[in-house]
């Protein structure tokens, strides 16, 4: 289990991360691109993964980690249920999403 504040701290611990509002939710960005949003009322976190990473993480347990049920889920946006996820799994997902954005910046 991961509480809201711990999830926030995990995201903010990644180098260069900024927290900004995104439609009333905390979002976490690097290079001005969102890699995660915190859904406080729902007690979940959205992590923006590649489709391959989304598939790998979701294979752990589709009740805990699953694509966002809208068009964004088809682009890698993935929900993590904070009440059921281990801190290590969430940290791994956040780091993976953060690395993907940082790597894109270096490609430019």
Where are these regions (language model features)?
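Charge-dense, helix-prone N-terminal extensions
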Residues: 1-108
């Amino acid at each position: 289990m991961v509480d809201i504040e711990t999830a926030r701290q995990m995201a903010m611990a990644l180098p260069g991360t900024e927290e900004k509002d995104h439609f009333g939710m905390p979002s976490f960005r690097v290079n001005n691109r969102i890699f995660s949003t915190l859904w406080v009322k729902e007690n979940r976190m959205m992590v923006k993964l590649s489709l391959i990473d989304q598939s790998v993480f979701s294979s752990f347990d589709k009740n805990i980690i699953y694509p966002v049920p809208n068009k964004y889920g088809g682009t890698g946006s993935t929900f993590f249920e904070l009440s059921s996820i281990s801190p290590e799994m969430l940290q791994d997902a956040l780091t993976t999403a953060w690395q993907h954005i940082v790597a894109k910046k270096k490609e430019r």
